């Protein structure tokens, strides 16, 4: 037997905290057990502890090739029964954030003709035996601008067709939440929609960035009202993304107070640095970041930082069962770039099929995100899978230079501890048949 290659360790108050990134498991052992395993003295470990270590993937048999097993998982994901359809109902937006990379198109929306094309495309997907669910992700622009008039009727029409096939649709919405009004919430509840809602920090900072003539007193309170209205109305799920820079964390206590009463299973916090900013050289941002993470965990909020998590792909957009369809019928393969002719990869036709630009499609299809030497060596590979295909297309052979670990603003020991505490809180909220092991 041998230690899993994908073990990470950090000291903790009870001994050594183990994190296996392959199986996404955690354990705490005493220091003596840790030393015995590092020296290969498995016969000196108690049978109970050894069984727990093996059962959770921290120790594997000598002939196990974990990397090869991972690669098999990577390619299996491409045959999933879920199809991910990102729909851009509009590239217009009712706020203008200085950091937004998109080129907004005022007044753009889904015409009746384009709605028919999307419906036929969804029909064609649902007619396939290997597709059981279409996951609609509404993106933009601001996808809620014409929701009641155009988007909701289209989704219900597709949902009704899916029912005739004993299939289903799921709906998630990436929104600034300023268009979520009380009359729309019952529609969202009927669709069981989930959300990513973005704020730019505390009230004053958010209002200085997300400005709208319609909301003269600012949009922050509008967003907070929408969060409460949604979570009070139905069993919604909200990923509250907080965009931050070097000043944001100094004033975030007010945000904590504003969401303190939200049911914990209905909300998760995600921290994302504004991509045009960099951490300060004196590491004060990392200190504030760590303190905020710990404060949120103490209050039993689930939280994510950096795009690591056990999955079988680098980016959802990399999967074969994925497409991005714009309001005008143009088709893309990435939501992290502006929706222009440069990045367009196809067009939706009247019969509900896609005419692809085959040279672009084939170039993307040949890329594996996991096989850069730096990624092969990395113990976080099962949680990352390397740069996404879009970045590899733009920056070939740059995986090590562009590794997300280079942007991590807390230490690896702090990161492992945060992940453990976050998992503990998740299991406390939702329950789990395999509790965290303390040995």
Predicted segments, located by residue:
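Local cysteine-cluster metal-coordination motifs and their immediate loop/turn environment
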Residues: 92-102, 371-391
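Short Fe-S-cluster ligation motifs
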Residues: 121-141, 401-439
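N-terminal pre-triad scaffold of radical SAM enzymes
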Residues: 75-101, 119, 123, 128-137, ...
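C-terminal accessory region of radical SAM enzymes
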Residues: 284-310, 336-385
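N-terminal [4Fe-4S]-dependent radical SAM core
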Residues: 3-28, 47-86, 129, 438-439
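Radical SAM/AdoMet-radical enzyme domain recognition
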Residues: 119-137, 146-273
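Short, small/polar residue-rich loop motifs at catalytic or cofactor-binding pockets
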Residues: 316-320
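Flexible glycine/acidic-rich beta-alpha junction loops that bind and position SAM and/or redox cofactors
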Residues: 204-209, 267-286, 308-315, 338-345
């Amino acid at each position: 037997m041998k230690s899993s290659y994908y073990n990470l360790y950090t000291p903790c108050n009870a001994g050594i905290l183990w994190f296996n990134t392959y199986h996404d498991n955690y354990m705490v052992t005493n220091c003596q057990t840790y030393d015995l395993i590092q020296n290969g003295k498995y016969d000196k470990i108690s049978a109970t502890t050894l069984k727990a270590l093996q059962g959770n993937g921290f120790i594997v048999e000598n002939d196990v090739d974990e990397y090869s097993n991972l690669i098999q998982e990577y390619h299996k994901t491409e045959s999933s029964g879920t199809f991910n359809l990102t729909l851009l109902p509009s590239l217009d937006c009712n706020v203008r954030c200085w950091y937004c990379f998109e080129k907004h198109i005022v007044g753009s929306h889904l015409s009746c003709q384009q709605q028919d094309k999307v419906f036929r495309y969804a029909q064609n997907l649902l007619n396939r035996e290997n597709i059981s669910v279409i996951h609609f992700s509404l993106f933009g622009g601001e996808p809620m601008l014409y929701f009641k008039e155009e988007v909701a009727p289209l989704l219900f029409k597709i949902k009704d067709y899916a029912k005739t096939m004993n299939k289903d649709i799921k709906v998630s919405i990436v929104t600034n939440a300023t268009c979520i009004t009380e009359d729309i919430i019952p529609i969202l509840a009927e669709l069981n929609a989930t959300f990513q809602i973005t704020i730019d920090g505390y009230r004053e900072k958010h209002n200085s960035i997300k400005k709208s003539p319609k909301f003269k007193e600012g949009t922050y309170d509008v967003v907070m009202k929408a969060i409460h209205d949604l979570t009070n109305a139905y069993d919604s799920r909200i990923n509250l993304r907080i965009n931050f820079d070097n000043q944001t964390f100094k004033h975030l206590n007010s945000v904590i107070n504003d969401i303190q009463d939200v049911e914990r299973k209905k909300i998760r916090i995600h921290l994302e640095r504004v991509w045009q900013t960099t951490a300060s050289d004196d590491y004060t941002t990392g200190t504030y970041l760590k303190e905020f993470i710990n404060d949120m965990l103490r209050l039993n909020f689930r939280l994510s930082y950096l795009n690591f998590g056990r999955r079988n792909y680098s980016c959802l957009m990399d999967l074969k069962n994925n497409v991005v369809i714009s309001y005008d019928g143009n088709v893309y393969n990435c939501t992290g770039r502006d929706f222009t002719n440069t990045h367009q990869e196809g067009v939706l036709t009247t019969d509900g099929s896609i005419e692809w630009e085959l040279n672009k499609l084939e170039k993307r299809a040949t890329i594996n995100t996991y096989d850069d030497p730096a990624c092969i060596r990395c113990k976080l590979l099962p949680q990352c899978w390397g740069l996404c295909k879009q970045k590899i297309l733009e920056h070939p052979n740059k995986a090590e230079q562009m590794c997300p670990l280079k942007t991590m603003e807390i230490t690896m020991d702090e990161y492992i501890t945060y992940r453990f505490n976050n998992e503990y809180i998740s299991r406390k909220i939702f329950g789990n048949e395999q509790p965290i092991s303390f040995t």
